[in-house]
Amino acid sequence: MRKIVLTAVLAALPATAMAEGLEDLVEARRGYYKLLGANMGELVAMVKGEAEYDGATAQTHAANLVTLTNYNLGHLYAPGTSKADLPGETRALPEIWDDMAGVQEKGMAFVEAVNELNEVAGLDKAELAAGVQKLGGTCKGCHDDYRAKDF
Ligand code: HEC
């Protein structure tokens, strides 16, 4: 019932105000993923030897990723925010809204890999490398199906 009321309120808003609101949501969504990417980037650099392995730093980035998995993204995936709705602004494929269960599944694999990484990131470089590789596979797993190659 609450959902229906909310829809009615949204429908009453001027179209431009709503489009702006949705654009803000998309920006926030992309910001979330940028945070994932920023932390992952530091870890990958250590694995590749572009940065020196440091257990405490690796642990910090792994813990940041755990923190990010506790964020509920649901509101950032409001209807009307796919690449089909806002071309040029987002790479989120419309398939996401047709297959929330599939997205959820990819999300769960990602959360699991983050938690595993967090267990080992501070131990040594080999453990970090294995954890990062597994996690990277779960990022790619979702991107392959639900993120467009370009905007
Ligand atoms: C459950 C699905 C899913 C998982 C898991 C996932 N992503 Fe994404 N990611 C997306 C989607 C969808 C977008 C496109 C968002 C948009 O353009 O609105 C995206 C966008 C991005 C972007 C681009 C942000 C920008 O500048 O527009 C980066 C960077 C990124 N993801 C990194 C990661 C990393 C790193 C991981 C794993 C640690 C990860 N993602 C895991 C779905 C996922």
Model-derived regions, located:
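Sec/Tat signal peptide C-region and signal peptidase I cleavage site
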Residues: 13-21
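Sequence context surrounding c-type heme c attachment/ligation sites in exported
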Residues: 23-151
